[in-house]
Every structure is written in structure tokens, then in C-alpha cells.
Amino acid sequence: MSHTVLVCDDAIFMRTMISDILTQAGYEVVGEAETGAQAVERFKELSPDLVMMDIVMPVMGGIDAVREIIKIAPNAKILMCSAMGQQALVVEAIQAGARDFIVKPFQPSRVLEAVQRVLE
């Protein structure tokens, strides 16, 4: 059985690119979210094996969404996606409970390496 993934990013092109990379590698993308609040709701509905989370999103940012998801499921596996220059936010996300991060723009191989590491 393939691992299930929830992809959360406010930019549709990023959600599509990440979903394509994961699907081609055999992962099952079970849902998408464009805000942190939506990410929390979809997490409750879908219980995915992994959440790919953008840091900067409208309504509720990725870091607050990580905190909410960790309250629901302390062992949730969350991989942050951040733009260059957001190191302080990445540290905050890891402290909130995220397992790892990748920096945009990224190579598909880097995405898959990080996903495998987080799911181990």
C-alpha cells in the first residue's frame, strides 16, 4: 500500500507540481489545501501519512496549522516547504512539530529524499 499525502500550499501550481512529483513516485495524494485552516480540516478528514505544508498561506499560516495538527495527532509527519530566506520560520516550524523542510525552488529528487526521510 502506498503512503498517503496531503499537499498544502496557497499556490495551485505548487500543489500541482508537488502532487505530480509524489504521484509519479508511487505516493497517493489524497487531498489538497490552500490555507492553513483548510489543511487542519483536511488532516482531520483524511488522516494522511504525510503532510506537505507551505509556511506562508492566507487565513492560517503553515506554522499555526502544524501546531493545530500536532494537537490532534502528536506523531503527525509534516514536511515544510519554504521559500529562500525563511530560515527563522523554518526553525519555528520544526519547533512546532514539523519533521523536516525543503526550500523552494526544489528539484524532484530533493522532494522525494525528504519525503522518504520523514516517512521512515
Where are these regions (language model features)?
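C-terminal output helix
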Residues: A88, F106-V115
